[in-house]
Amino acid sequence: MMNRYNETGTIINFSARTYMNHKCICTYASDDEKLHAIIDDYGVMYSPDGKRLLDTVRQLKHYEVPEGVEVICDGAFCFSGLESIKLPDSLLAIGCNAFGNTRLTALTIPRNVRHIAPVNPIATNQLLLDKFECLSPYFKVVKGILYSKDNVIFYGAVTEDYPEELEILEGVKAIANGAMSHRAHLKSVSIPDSVTVMGDGAFHCSGVKKVKLSQNIDRIPAECFDDCRLEVFIVPEGVVNVDDSALGHNDNLITVIFPKTLKNMGYNVFSGCPSLTRISGPRKSNFMNLKDLQKAGLRKGVRSTRENCIIDSYDSNREGVTMHLHN
């Protein structure tokens, strides 16, 4: 699986696009497009034919996108300060993080929208919407959660009435990037075995304490459970990769259990986890050693609640966690 960053800093996880069974529309605005763009009186940038809204070049509070616009590109209104927006019926596609870090309180998805990039459209907003209306037959809202109509893609929370104990619908195959990011009221999540792909930062900075993971995923993505309230995290058999900062900054995390299938562990996987006292993994694993665990975020000389534990059973003078090895 290959990731890239777009110009707004949003990680785009391309594997999630596999599950778009309707027509994918390009929402990326290239530098060349912006070089030849037309800028209106509000500082909003358009392609020369007026069909693609590319970006904003200054702050604005209220805006009406004109009829004829078919695509709102990745990050187009991100950090714009936008408080309200009206979208046209001509709109077909909404890009990654198009309305992230704005002050929107309401949003209506027009009836002809057939493509929303696999990122929660308000993923980086600290506050959820008071009102979200979806007129498109390609999507639906269930208890404050946006899904594709066929349940294949879980986009995440869009309004405050999302459940504290979340059970993602059976049949979902992909969880969008940033799906439940910054959703402080979330306490637990149950992910069905139909899910095969989770997006980067899917539960980042949420209040989740307990997770039931799908048994059919092969990766814990970057920052997926970073800055949560987890106490125990069991990585399912079949997972091959745990990416950078996947479990970082969980102050209450005590135990992490890795499977035999794990082959790669990223940087800072559990950096900033002061309560971590147990890491369990297979005896023959190539990562259950001091060097790789330090790469993953365990640093020598860090004073914490694990100061009486050891990081390596061959050197009792090192502070850290006890490794539990099993066959």
What are the language-model segments listed below?
Residues 1-45, 51, 56-71, 79-93, ...:
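Structural signature of tandem-repeat unit edges
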Residues 96, 118:
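Short glycine-/acidic-enriched loop or helix-start segments at secondary-structure transitions
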Residues 120-122:
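Short, well-ordered secondary-structure "scaffold" segments embedded in the functional core
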